[in-house]
Design a protein with these regions (language model features):
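Membrane-interface interhelical linkers
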Residues: 3-32, 65-93, 144, 196, ...
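Hydrophobic alpha-helical transmembrane segments of multi-pass membrane transport proteins
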Residues: 35-39, 43, 94-111, 173-184, ...
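Helix-helix packing/entry segments at the starts of transmembrane helices
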Residues: 121-125, 192-202, 241-276
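Glycine-/small-residue-enriched transmembrane alpha-helix faces in small-molecule transporters
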Residues: 9-54, 155-187, 209, 273
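Structural motif at transmembrane-helix junctions in multi-pass transporters
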Residues: 49-54, 105-122, 245-262, 281
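Hydrophobic transmembrane alpha-helices of multi-pass small-molecule transport proteins
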Residues: 67, 145-161, 172-176, 285-301
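Juxtamembrane helix-loop-helix junctions in multi-pass membrane proteins
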Residues: 36-63, 117-118, 180-205, 220
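C-terminal-most transmembrane helix of multi-pass membrane proteins
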Residues: 16, 264-301
């Protein structure tokens, strides 16, 4: 057949390529997800009369029902078959499910015990912990500015530990557990929402068993006559899944560098919630420590 028509190169002066327009829906989904994560403390605070382990167990049970239902309606059971066909992935998701349940436990305990400010610090330092894991585990290389950023953040944490009387263990526990969780999920190479569904299914039996014991002992919070608490416990599962579904949608459609900036929406809103809405202290000492970490993030970013 005839040769395909090829347009001759145009001799017009070169114009620098414009960056592609940002996907509005993707951006909106990502921002909405981070805002939801940011106001989580206010939600869990409403359940502070319920023991933390019961809150986590309900969160797992209702999250499993919501996410599995969402996936089955959307695409059937293929996601589960795909994961089960790779045993290594199953073991990795077992490890990640234990880490995320620990992370949720520390976070809910912090919120219901007046430590939201400390919890927010955990998510400010999380990106820098990710950097260190990248260096130590994935053998990524840092430039001088990035090393300076990590050093300043470490000094900020040391300042908080020495002058605040005790190490910011809630912040460190949240940052480390979430960073290692992120690493395992990266290596497992499973999409965010199917991964959360499988993690929830792994944790489902222990969660149901714990709730069963609580009900049998007469200390179960669910169904004890307070319909508001019951509704909050049920919707906590959907609220766990919704931002992750939104984030999974958004992160695929916007530049990853933009995700890196947007991730600070959540801890900023958590800090504001803790100080202005829940009345927690934010001392000058803490301001200096947080300030060092914000400087580090600005240098790294």
């Amino acid at each position: 057949g005839p040769a395909p028509f090829v347009r001759a190169p145009c001799p017009e002066p070169a114009v620098p390529a414009a960056s592609p327009p940002i996907d509005r829906k993707g951006l909106s989904a990502a921002i909405a997800s981070y805002v939801l994560w940011g106001v989580f403390p206010l939600y869990w605070y409403l359940l502070k009369h319920v023991p933390s382990l019961q809150i986590i167990s309900h969160r797992i049970v209702w999250c499993a029902l919501f996410v599995v239902g969402f996936l089955v309606l959307r695409e059937g059971w293929g996601w589960l078959r795909a994961a089960l066909s790779r045993p290594r992935v199953g073991w990795m998701l077992l490890a990640s499910s234990l880490l995320i349940s620990f992370n949720w436990g520390v976070y809910i305990w912090a919120v219901t015990n007046g430590r939201v400010v400390e919890a927010s610090l955990g998510y400010f330092i999380n990106p820098l912990v990710n950097v260190l894991i990248g260096v130590l585990v994935l053998h990524e290389r840092l430039n001088r500015a990035q090393w300076i950023a990590v050093a300043i953040a470490a000094l900020g944490l040391l300042w908080l530990a020495l002058l605040h009387g005790d190490p910011p263990w809630i912040s460190l526990a949240l940052a480390l557990s979430f960073a290692i969780y992120g690493l395992i999920r990266k290596l497992a190479n499973v999409d965010a929402v199917p991964g959360l569904a499988i993690e929830s299914l792994i944790l489902l039996l222990p969660a149901l068993a714990w709730l069963g014991v609580a009900q049998a002992q007469g200390v179960g919070a669910f169904g004890s006559g307070d319909w508001r608490s019951d509704a909050l416990l049920v919707f906590g599962g959907a609220l766990t899944a919704l931002p992750l579904i939104g984030f999974a949608y958004g992160a695929r459609r916007i530049p990853y560098s933009l995700v890196g900036i947007l991730q600070y929406i959540a801890p900023t809103l958590q800090l504001i919630s803790g100080v202005w809405l829940l009345g927690e202290d934010f001392t000058g000492t803490q301001a200096v420590g947080f300030g060092a970490i914000w400087v580090a993030l600005a240098i790294y970013g």
